[in-house]
Amino acid sequence: MTTTLRATFTVQLTPADPIPGSAARFDLAKTWSGDLTGTSHGTMTTAGDPATGDAGYVATETFEGTIAGRVGTLTFLQLGTMAGGEPQLSYVIAPGSGTGQLVGKLGTLSIGDIDEDGNHEVTVQLA
C-alpha cells in the first residue's frame, strides 16, 4: 500500500572542497515540516553550467525525524539533470536505508513549487 504525504523543506547549501577535475561540491542541510518533520544532512556534487541550460547534480542526504508518525532515519538519493534547458529529477528513498520505525520503507519524492522564502513543496509516495 502506498501513502501520499506532503511536506516542505528549506535548504542551506555550503560550498565544500571541489572534487578534482571539475565537479563542485556542497554540504547541504534541510529542515522539514508537514508529514515529514525533522532534519536532513548530506552532500551534493554538481557539474556543467546551468546558465547555458546544460548541467547536473547528484545528492545523498540522511533524514532523521518523523514521517507520518513513524520515527527513524532514511537516506534520500537525488539525480538532477538539465539538457537544453529541460530539467529531469529522480528523488528516491534508498532501499535498505531505514532505521527505527522506518525500516523497510521505500518511496519517491517529487518537488513542486518553491516560494520566495525558499520553501520547497514536496509530495512523497511512501510504501
What label would you give each PLM region?
Residues M1-A127:
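Targeting-peptide/extracellular-domain and disordered-appendage signature
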